[in-house]
């Protein structure tokens, strides 16, 4: 493998991981802005709509450790791509949800994908970067998460 190819691959991996982690993190809080609108659109109360947020966060919290194990067993790339696909599918279902229960279920699907993305991201970066550059790459990913 040539040095140029290796350099290109590691930066592509960092960009992919940063995008996936950013989307998963952003989705955990951005829905809060829309809660009053969701309450109005679905003609329901805040007690029902709050589960849109809780379902996503609870799913990630429950699945992030098992997702890490799945990544170790099935391979980083395959699991990361599956995480992106599941997250995207969940996002599509969220956009098409006709009711709050279906929206909550769609957020659970999103949470499964997000858990795969979040658990696998640091492992992908650790594998892609040499030891002397690893800290900077992980720091860059941390900056993206906190942005």
Predicted feature residues:
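Transmembrane-helix bundle of Major Facilitator Superfamily
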Residues: 3-147
